[in-house]
Structures are given as structure tokens and as C-alpha cells.
């Protein structure tokens, strides 16, 4: 307030004593009014004024920026009086200002108190609002901080658990690493020992190789000499075999001549020594040939009941006691077994090689007496096996040469690859199987297929290396599987009472 009044007083003095070369109006002589606006309050000051007019300085000895004077201009020799007058005027102004200040203070007390009270009330209301807002914001922030704290605690707990798990895993890994390190060290030690042993073995092996090289050279010389000897022996054997074949042929021709002579003598009624007529009994099968004293495997002539002509067959006198009549043989694929019904009926091929005896002859032979069947098998690795049946016979042509078997044994599988309950014979031109697919056309050859079945010894012949994965080959399922084509097969029969 004091500063404000000081500014007001300064403004009044400047207004009062300024020299502007303007004349005052008559109504304003002796007094001067000054109005000051401060906020909502307006203050009017009445300032006394000295009689006389301000003179304008005409001399250059005074400052050009000098203020207008209240007293009339006098000459310089009256300067002391002027100063006294000014001092007196200043004292009056000072007293007047003190009175004015006291008046303003007295009159402004109530207004200032009211203003302060209003300001305090407004400030209090504002502070209350601000406080309320701060409290609500503080509560909201506190709630958020609580949530954040909860989340932080939960996250911290999870992190602690995870850290603990990681610590356990790290401990386990360290333990495993330590164990593996120990094992690696042990293995390294073993490797060192093995390397040492290997070096020793290499030295010994080198010595042995040198020895073997010497022995190999000696053996090669020996093999060369033995090869020459073997070749000479083979030549001798071939010559002996040729001679033997000639002798066998001569023997067969001689036997045929003897049989013809016997038959001729029987028909002409020739009497033998002692005057008795003896009827010659022909060979019904190879068992009769064997029992007659012929125990060498080869081709013999037999006389089958109800057949108009004799039949040449191959007799196996070596396997399981001999006396076997061969009815089928495969060995080199030189004969085509994809034949028709009539050919399988009467037979085809050469008894000394690959051949089929003929269904009509097999039926006639097995109708004479009870027979057993033996099947010899060999694969391309040289393994041999057999299947044997205690009872074997087939029906006539009207019965489609139906197969009848009983009592299976042997090494070519625990189960029989032939149909035991009976199956009709089928060829490419006579489909008698139990399948819509015509097994004889699909699997080739003539056989007792039933529903194509697990065997076909008259199938296509495949050479070594091409015998795998062949469903239409020479197969015996329970020996080598359904798609392995065998190297050789032999089917032969012998009387049960042999």
C-alpha cells in the first residue's frame, strides 16, 4: 500500500509542478484534482496549488529539462527565498500525505478485511475442491499402485519360481555335464589304450599279411597244379560218362528186346524149360523195377493197367530207398509248360529232362494201388527241401483229374502248399479253379489251383537274379514265399506198401 501511495504522490507532484506553458482555468485556481483507479476502487486527490503563474525560463544558465515551478519566476538573486519557499511547500505536502495515508488506512481497513475474507473463502473453497480432487486422484492412484504392486508381486513370485526352476535345471545340467566330462575322460583313456593295442595289432597284422602272401603264392601254385589235374580228371570222367550212357542205352535196348521176346513167347505159347509155361509179369511202376533188381536211376518202360501201350518213365532209385516213379521234373527252363488240356492229359517232354508224365497216366497208375507222393524242391541258393504225402491219387478226366491228398510231412513248410481237401486241374483252355480270375492264364501252366492257391510247380521258369517278385513262377509258398521262383522241382510217386 505504501508503494502504491508513493506512486500516486509522485504522479500528483509531476502534474502539479510540470511547466507546459498552459494557463489554468479560473475555476481550478488554488486547487487541483487528481483521480486514480485501482481495481474496483477509485481515489480522488485534492492537491493545493500556489498562487501565481509558472514562468518559462528564458535564460540559458538553467537546465532546459527543469520542472515547472509553483512559485513565480524571480530573479536569481532571490534563490534563497525560493528554496525556503520550496521547503515550506514540501513540508506542507509531507504533512498532507501523512494525513492522506492515515485516512486511506482507516478507510481501507474494512474493505481490505472484506477482500481478505472473500479471498480466504474463495481460496478455502478452491483448496477444498483441489483437496477433494487430490484425494480422489490419490485414492485412484493408490488403487492403481496397489494393482501394480500386486501384479509386480505376482510377477516377482513367478520370476522367483522360474529362477528357482532354472537354478535346479542348471544344477542338474552341471551335474550331467560333470558326469559326461568324467565319461569323456574315461573314454579318452580307453581310446588311448585301444590306439596302443591297434598299433600293436597293425604290426602283428602286417607280419601275418606277409606270411599270408607267401602262403597265397604257394597255394596259387598248388591250385594251378590241381586245376590241371582236375581238368584231366574231368576229361576222363566225361569219357567214362559217355561210355556209361552208351552202356545204359544198350541195357535199355536189351531189356526192351527181352520184354518183346517174353511177350512173343507168351503169345506163341512157347514152353520154358521143365515143360512149364510161365507168364511174364510186366513192370507196373518203378517200384516193380527196383524190386526186380534194377537199382540204378534212369529211364525204364512200364506197363500201366488199362493203357494200350507201355510208357517210358524216369525211375529215381536213390532218394529215400528208391522205387520212385517221376511224374514231373523242372530243372533248366528248356521246356514250355504253358500247355493246353490235351497235352497235360497225355504228357509232354523227355523223361531224361524236363517233362510231365500226363494226367491220364497218373490217374491209371494211382488207380492200380495206393500211392504216396514226394516233392523235391531246390532254391537258387542250393537249399533243398521236400514235402511228402502218405496218400495220393487223382480222379479221371470227367472229374477234372481232381487231386486227393492225406498226411503231410516234410521240410518245405509246416503247412501243405497243396490243397489237401481236393482241387480240380486247370489249364489255359480249361478253367476249373474256384476263382473268377482264371488262375491258369494269370499264373501260367497247368495245376491244381483251387483259388489260385499257394503253389504252382508248372509255372514260368525264371533264371537266377530274376526269380524274385514273380507271382507266375515256380512257387511253393510255405518254402520260399508266394513270389520266389524255384530252381528245380521233382514230383514222384511210390506204392504205399513198398
Swiss-Prot record:
Q: Where is the signal peptide?
A: 1-15
Q: What is the effect of changing residue 225 to C?
A: In HAE5; uncertain significance; does not affect oligomerization; does not affect interaction with TEK
Recorded GO cellular component terms are:
collagen-containing extracellular matrix; extracellular exosome; extracellular region; extracellular space; membrane raft; microvillus; plasma membrane
Give the SUPFAM superfamilies listed for this entry.
Fibrinogen C-terminal domain-like (SSF56496)
Q: Where in the cell is it found?
A: Secreted
More details: It may have a potential therapeutic utility since it can be used for specifically targeting tumor vasculature or for promoting angiogenic processes in certain organs such as an ischemic heart.
Kindly provide the name given to this protein in its UniProt entry.
Answer: Angiopoietin-1
Lineage here is: Eukaryota, Metazoa, Chordata, Craniata, Vertebrata
Amino acid at each position: 500500500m505504501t508503494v502504491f501511495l508513493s506512486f500516486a504522490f509522485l504522479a500528483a507532484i509531476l502534474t502539479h509542478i510540470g511547466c507546459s506553458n498552459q494557463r489554468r482555468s479560473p475555476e481550478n485556481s488554488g486547487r487541483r484534482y487528481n483521480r486514480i483507479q485501482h481495481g474496483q476502487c477509485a481515489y480522488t486527490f485534492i492537491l493545493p496549488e500556489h498562487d501565481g503563474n509558472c514562468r518559462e525560463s528564458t535564460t540559458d544558465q538553467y537546465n532546459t529539462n527543469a520542472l515547472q515551478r509553483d512559485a513565480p519566476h524571480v530573479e536569481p538573486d532571490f534563490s534563497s527565498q525560493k528554496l525556503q519557499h520550496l521547503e515550506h511547500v514540501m513540508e506542507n505536502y509531507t504533512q498532507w500525505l501523512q494525513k492522506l495515508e492515515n485516512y486511506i488506512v482507516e478507510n481501507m481497513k474494512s474493505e481490505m478485511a472484506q477482500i481478505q475474507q472473500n479471498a480466504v473463502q474463495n481460496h478455502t473453497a478452491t483448496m477444498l475442491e483441489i483437496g477433494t480432487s487430490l484425494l480422489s486422484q490419490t485414492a485412484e492412484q493408490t488403487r492403481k499402485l496397489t494393482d501394480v504392486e500386486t501384479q509386480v508381486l505376482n510377477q516377482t513370485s513367478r520370476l522367483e519360481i522360474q529362477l528357482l526352476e532354472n537354478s535346479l535345471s542348471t544344477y542338474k545340467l552341471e551335474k550331467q555335464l560333470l558326469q559326461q566330462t568324467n565319461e569323456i575322460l574315461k573314454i579318452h583313456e580307453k581310446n588311448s589304450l585301444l590306439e596302443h593295442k591297434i598299433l600293436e595289432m597293425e604290426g602283428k597284422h602286417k607280419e601275418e599279411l606277409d606270411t599270408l602272401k607267401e602262403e597265397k603264392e604257394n597255394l596259387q601254385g598248388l591250385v594251378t597244379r590241381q586245376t590241371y589235374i582236375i581238368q584231366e580228371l574231368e576229361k576222363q570222367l566225361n569219357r567214362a560218362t559217355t561210355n556209361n550212357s552208351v552202356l545204359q542205352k544198350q541195357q535199355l535196348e536189351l531189356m526192351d528186346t527181352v520184354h518183346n521176346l517174353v511177350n512173343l513167347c507168351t503169345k506163341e505159347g512157347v514152353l520154358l524149360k521143365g515143360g512149364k509155361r510161365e507168364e511174364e509179369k510186366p513192370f507196373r511202376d518203378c517200384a516193380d523195377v527196383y524190386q526186380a533188381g534194377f537199382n540204378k536211376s534212369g529211364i525204364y518202360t512200364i506197363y500201366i493197367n488199362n493203357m494200350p501201350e507201355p510208357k517210358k518213365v524216369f525211375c529215381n532209385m536213390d532218394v529215400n530207398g528208391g522205387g520212385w516213379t517221376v511224374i514231373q521234373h523242372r530243372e533248366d527252363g528248356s521246356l514250355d509248360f504253358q500247355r493246353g488240356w490235351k497235352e497235360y492229359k497225355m504228357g509232354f517232354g523227355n523223361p531224361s529232362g524236363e517233362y510231365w508224365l500226363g494226367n491220364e497216366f497218373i490217374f491209371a497208375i494211382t488207380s492200380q494201388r495206393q500211392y504216396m507222393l514226394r516233392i523235391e524242391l531246390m532254391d537258387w541258393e542250393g537249399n533243398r527241401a521236400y514235402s511228402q504225402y502218405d496218400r495220393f491219387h487223382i480222379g479221371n478226366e470227367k472229374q477234372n483229374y481232381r487231386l486227393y491228398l492225406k498226411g503231410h510231412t516234410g521240410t518245405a513248410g509246416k503247412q501243405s502248399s497243396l490243397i489237401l481237401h481236393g482241387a480240380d486241374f486247370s489249364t489255359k483252355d480249361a478253367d476249373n479253379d474256384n476263382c473268377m480270375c482264371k488262375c491258369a492264364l494269370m499264373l501260367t501252366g497247368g495245376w491244381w489251383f483251387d483259388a489260385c492257391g499257394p503253389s504252382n510247380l508248372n509255372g514260368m521258369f525264371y533264371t537266377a537274379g530274376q526269380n524274385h517278385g514273380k507271382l507266375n513262377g515256380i512257387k511253393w509258398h510255405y518254402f520260399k514265399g508266394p513270389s520266389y521262383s524255384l530252381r528245380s522241382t521233382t514230383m514222384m510217386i511210390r506204392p504205399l506198401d513198398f
